[in-house]
Amino acid sequence: MDTIHIRGGRRLNGRIPVSGAKNAALPLMTAALLTDEPLRLTNMPRLADVRTLTKLLAELGGDVAIDRGEDADVMTIRVADIKSTTAPYEIVSQIRASFWVLGPLLARCHEAKVSLPGGCAIGARPVDLYIKGLQKMGAEIDLVEGYVLAKAPGGLKGAVIRSPIVSVGATHTLMMAAALAEGVTVLENAAREPEIGDVANCLVAMGAKIEGIGTSTLRIEGVDRLHGATHRVIADRIEAGTYAVAAAMTGGEVVLEGVEAETFEAALSVLRAAGAGVESEQGAVRIFRNGERLQATDVVTQVFPGFPTDLQAQFMALMTTAEGESEITETIFENRFMHVQELARFGANISLHGDKALVHGVEKLKGAPVMASDLRASAALIIAGLAAEGETTINRVYHLDRGFERIEAKLSACGAEIWREKAK
């Protein structure tokens, strides 16, 4: 496995182009299953998860062409004929988002066999909401030997579906399924994340009829067929937030290009409260620090527009050297504090109390050998390594490649001393 090395203590200064959002790109790829015409996606990030989902689409009968650009790719997907409605364990176990093929396959083919999902090991993350929603739309579903077997012989029917909790995955799945269902589907308590809106806008470009985009109530009037379209993937607010934290922790000044501040305003608000400077302009955000020590700031993860759980680990790293004690509360996923013991190897002082972590700020961190436990924890360890004195070695960085594109190159361009040692 590859290893990342960092010599810390350097300020970041420069400009970082923010890649297309992983959490929009993946469901957009699955939306290509809803039509037999080409779906052209621009601003596609180059990520391991994208490559894995590409394999699954090919397994189902899709043709995927990629045009390499300087900073992003253009992906054209055409699924003229679905050759298989089975998403095998070997692929789905690698990436949770591959489970999202369930809705499009069921809507277009009236049947699907999809393995229960994999991805980062952060709690149970059950798929009950997906299944119950599809059942309300008339699907017959059984769980057999680790697979979801779904059938809708007469096609899916519109329904009013109220989710007991906000679920991004369930909203994606049910919205895509409803686009080809008979009648009107209303999704109440739907997720409002920008990535949901991005997928909805793409579906509209493909001919879907969706009202309430950006709100917690989506009204989808099913149509007989969808057509091809060209759609630009929105910027990755989690990547932007990660680099914003890195800039604040190391000092200096970084301009994040191609991202709108409102998509990650909750994170920027916490940065301001901690003492970092934040200035936004059209299509860019500038992060800077005047050299004074950051102040401890409490964080509670929430669904959008609240503070995102996918930035919790990065902000914990930031708080390890802030002045005072901060309380970080994780309300979205269980078991998402696996990075705590690795941050402690840098000299961080963190104690766990159920769903809360108390971070007692220390004067400085010291470089250490550490191991990544999941995607976002990997980013937190890189941030800590950038600020720490001495050299840091991060193992198991395959997690990182699932969600961050060219992270070493982007940080190096801003003055970081960071490099990758390829596995022998």
From Swiss-Prot:
GO terms for biological process: cell division; cell wall organization; peptidoglycan biosynthetic process; regulation of cell shape; UDP-N-acetylgalactosamine biosynthetic process. Its EC number is 2.5.1.7. Phosphoenolpyruvate binds at residues 22-23. UDP-N-acetyl-alpha-D-glucosamine binds at residues 96, 125-129, 310, 332. It catalyses: phosphoenolpyruvate + UDP-N-acetyl-alpha-D-glucosamine = UDP-N-acetyl-3-O-(1-carboxyvinyl)-alpha-D-glucosamine + phosphate. The keyword Cell division applies. One of its GO terms (molecular function) is UDP-N-acetylglucosamine 1-carboxyvinyltransferase activity. It is an enzyme of class 2 (transferase). The active site is at residue 120. Keywords: Cell cycle, Cell division, Cell shape, Cell wall biogenesis/degradation, Cytoplasm, Peptidoglycan synthesis, Pyruvate, Transferase. Pfam families: EPSP_synthase. The modification 2-(S-cysteinyl)pyruvic acid O-phosphothioketal is found at residue 120. It is found in: Cytoplasm. Pathway: Cell wall biogenesis; peptidoglycan biosynthesis. GO terms for cellular component: cytoplasm. Cell wall formation. Adds enolpyruvyl to UDP-N-acetylglucosamine. Belongs to the EPSP synthase family. MurA subfamily. This is UDP-N-acetylglucosamine 1-carboxyvinyltransferase. It comes from Parvibaculum lavamentivorans (strain DS-1 / DSM 13023 / NCIMB 13966). The gene is murA.
